[in-house]
């Protein structure tokens, strides 16, 4: 799935010049190869499992994005922390246009397990529509055991119980705030909605809290998103300030795409909000993303060929080599899935919102939602001509660079529309 945070699965190091136990040195060597576009040397560092997952298409996609940031101006010292037996090594790299944090997970054997990168966001400030005196926050834990996730519950002040909503992430390893550049989509939504009488639960995505989760052989959208969303809904219903029969789901991007599946599994949703979400298959959206990133020639042809192979997958192809960065089990989990078709069968109240300046989707998928669900009395649709991928208002074509401008927030119109719909 498209994302501001691209997750690259990699592992295994063959480097005579770096001691296997030197996690910082191993990570820095990998970073140097990445920045200098020495992809064959980077590939030589991968274990067989990672080589299977770390496709040429993913390398091409990564390289194109990194080159777009301009020349490297400085690389910070490694910051190392332990999670279990793994070492997480982070570097801040200053490019001509922005500063990026790269994170590497290094196993105790000296293997690279995961690599992530994300922009360093400016200091966040409350949006003008947030009323801090009108809500309170507390830390909660979603789930238990191996994949328990830290979260934040934002609750209106006053006499409840209140309607509540769980926020579900886009693709990639998102944090609980759904931080994208300088914009914190979920934090804005949480404070804005809580200021208007709606309790909000947001949490760290599993692949953010546990990067190794994406490497599991049985990794699917069920493991990535659905399981934790279901647990979060149950947790929200159990809160004394929340009215159990008025619990909603808000899915952003990928979260909106799979919202009907979450609703089907839950069976008790008061409604679901779908925001800037594709209605078409992931492989189709990925090709659109490649065009946006100006991938051409042989690289684009490779993506087209892999998308065609995805269309032909069938049960029994679980062991197929990853296509467009997605494993066989992940792709088969979504094979034949139609979010609009399932939504129509469920009959759950829906609010579908789309920023028309979304540089990846535009209104193409919104039109699919609109056409497919035409005549459904339980469905409300609205598009915003001025809003972009992160629901920020602007003019003209939007770009990823827009997301890095400080002081931007989700538009108040979105907050008001969602709160009004949930409180009706």
At which residue positions do the language-model features occur?
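N-terminal cap/lid segment of alpha/beta-hydrolase-fold proteins
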Residues: 122-159
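Short beta-strand/loop motif that positions the catalytic acidic residue
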Residues: 346, 352-354
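Accessory cap/linker subdomain of secreted extracellular hydrolases
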Residues: 265, 271-345, 375
């Amino acid at each position: 799935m498209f994302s501001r945070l691209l997750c690259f699965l990699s592992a295994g190091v063959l480097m005579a010049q770096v001691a296997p136990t030197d996690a910082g040195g191993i990570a820095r060597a990998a970073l140097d190869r990445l920045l200098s576009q020495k992809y064959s040397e980077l590939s030589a560092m991968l274990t067989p499992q990672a080589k299977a997952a770390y496709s040429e298409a993913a390398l091409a996609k990564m390289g194109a994005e990194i080159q777009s940031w301009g020349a490297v101006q400085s690389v910070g010292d490694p910051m190392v922390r332990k999670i279990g037996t793994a070492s997480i090594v982070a570097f801040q790299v200053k490019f001509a246009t922005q500063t990026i944090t790269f994170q590497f997970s290094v196993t105790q054997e000296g293997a690279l397990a995961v690599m992530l990168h994300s922009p360093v966001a400016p200091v966040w400030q409350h949006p003008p529509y947030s009323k801090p005196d009108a809500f309170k926050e507390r830390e909660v834990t979603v789930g238990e055991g191996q994949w328990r996730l830290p979260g934040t519950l934002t609750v209106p002040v006053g006499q409840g119980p209140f309607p509540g909503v769980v926020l579900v992430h886009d693709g990639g390893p998102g944090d609980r705030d759904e931080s994208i550049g300088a914009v914190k989509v979920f934090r804005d939504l949480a404070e804005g909605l809580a200021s208007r009488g709606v309790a909000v639960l947001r949490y760290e995505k599993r692949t953010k809290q546990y990067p190794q989760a994406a490497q599991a052989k049985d990794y699917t959208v069920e493991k990535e998103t659905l399981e934790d969303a279901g647990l979060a809904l149950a947790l929200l219903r159990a809160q004394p300030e929340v009215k159990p029969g008025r619990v909603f789901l808000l899915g952003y991007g990928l979260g909106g795409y799979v919202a009907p599946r979450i609703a089907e599994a839950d069976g008790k949703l008061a409604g679901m909000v779908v925001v800037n979400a594709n209605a078409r298959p992931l492989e189709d959206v990925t090709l659109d993303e490649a065009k946006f990133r100006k991938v051409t020639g042989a690289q684009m042809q490779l993506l087209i060929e892999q998308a065609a192979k995805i269309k032909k997958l069938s049960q029994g192809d679980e062991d197929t080599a990853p296509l467009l960065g997605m494993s066989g089990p992940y792709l088969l989990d979504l094979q034949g899935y139609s979010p609009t078709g399932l939504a129509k069968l469920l009959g759950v109240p829906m609010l579908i919102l789309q920023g028309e300046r979304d540089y990846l989707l535009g209104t193409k998928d919104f039109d699919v939602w609109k056409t497919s669900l035409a005549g459904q009395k339980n469905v409300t649709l609205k598009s915003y001509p001025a809003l972009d991928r992160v629901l920020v208002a602007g003019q003209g074509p939007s770009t990823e660079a827009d997301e890095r401008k400080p002081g931007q927030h989700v538009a108040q119109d979105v907050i008001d529309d969602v709160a009004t719909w949930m409180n009706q």
